[in-house]
Regions:
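Conserved ABC transporter NBD signature motif
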Residues: 56-64
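Conserved structural motif at the start of ABC-family nucleotide-binding domains
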Residues: 2, 17-19
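ABC ATPase NBD coupling module
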Residues: 65-79, 183
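Conserved ABC ATPase signature
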Residues: 132-136, 140
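Catalytic Walker B motif of ABC-type/P-loop ATPase nucleotide-binding domains
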Residues: 157-160
Length: 211
């Protein structure tokens, strides 16, 4: 699904990647590991079209990523989970979930039922749809973010230190939920320092700080 060929990325005088070659196949969960500064987040950002690269290429489904329109990519192909989630704090849970339903032709009642069903799936049946996101705990907010992904149903999921601010038990629960989203047509790439998380991936990619 994603092919990275001879990728080079620099920040000023510092080289992050030099002639990097990687393949990521659909149907798998990959974990990016390595010390701070090795380029895990930078690599995710480049795959997400949030960070340019200097040389080389990234192909997504056989197409040059640079030639794919960002609006189409974000709307139809990608969900990117940051440490601070992909939610709007001052909006309600319902309003955030609406962003995962863009393009779905549902009447008001069906839309509400769909949101309630997906919240139940991620263990948040007790959450009110009109509750503001900033009122939620970190674990609850992560679950809402995953609920939004379930609604959007993207072929590519990127996650950057998804559970870094959570306790071990909640981290495992969030990872378990993320793994339920795995299917043969979806690629999931997770950047993490947590051995408990990366040991559950299908494949581990170890990045090193360039000399």
């Amino acid at each position: 699904m994603i092919k990275i060929h001879q990728l080079t990325k620099t920040f000023g005088d510092r080289t992050v990647f030099s002639d990097l070659n990687l393949n990521f196949d659909a149907g798998k969960v990959y974990a990016l590991i390595g010390n701070s500064g090795c380029g895990k987040t930078t690599l995710l950002n480049m795959v997400a079209k949030l960070e340019p690269y200097d040389q080389g290429s990234i192909q997504y489904k056989g197409k040059d990523l640079r030639k794919i329109k960002p609006t189409n990519y974000f709307r139809n192909e990608l969900c990117y989970l940051f440490q601070n989630f992909v939610l709007i704090d001052n909006k309600t849970v319902s309003e955030n979930l609406d962003l995962g339903l863009i393009g779905h032709k549902l009447d008001k009642q069906k839309k509400r039922e769909t949101k309630e069903e997906v919240l139940d799936r991620v263990g948040l049946s007790y959450i009110q749809l009109d509750q503001k996101v900033y009122e939620l705990s970190g674990g609850e907010a992560q679950r809402v973010a995953l609920a939004k992904i379930i609604l959007k149903d993207p072929p590519l999921i990127l996650a950057d230190e998804l559970t870094a601010a959570l306790d071990p038990e909640t981290s495992q629960e969030i990872m378990d939920l993320l793994l339920t989203l795995k299917n043969k047509e979806r690629l999931i790439i997770i950047a993490t320092h947590n051995p408990t998380i990366w040991k559950q991936a299908d494949q581990v990619v170890s990045l090193k700080i360039s000399q």
